[in-house]
C-alpha cells in the first residue's frame, strides 16, 4: 500500500512539475542544493526541538528560535550565492562558444534560478515555523 501511494504521489508531482523533484534538485547543482537541504533539515530539527522544550523550558525554546532563523537565512544566502556562481559559469560557456543562442541562455537561467528558489523555500519554512512557535509560546 505504501509503495502504491508513493508511486501515485510521485506521478502527481511529475505531472505538475514535468520532472521529479530529485531531477530538479540535481539540475540546480548538487553542491549548493545539498547545502540548502542541510539548512532546511536544521530548521526542521530546531523547530521540533523548540516544540519539545515549550512545556519544560520556555526560555530555551525561545533561544532556539534564533537557530531556526539563522539556518533559514543561511539557506537563502547559499541559494543566492549558488545562483551567482551558476550565472558566472553560464556566461563563461556563452563566452567560449561565441554564440548566444536563446535555448542556451534559457537553460542557463533556469538552472541558475533553482538554487535561490530552494533557498527561498527554506527561508519561508523557517520563518513560518518561527511565527507559529511565537504564537504557541504566548
Per-region residue spans from a language model:
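Short, Lys/Arg-enriched N-terminal segments with co-localized hydrophobic residues
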Residues: 1-12
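Hydrophobic alpha-helical transmembrane segments of small proteolipidic membrane proteins, enriched
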Residues: 11-138
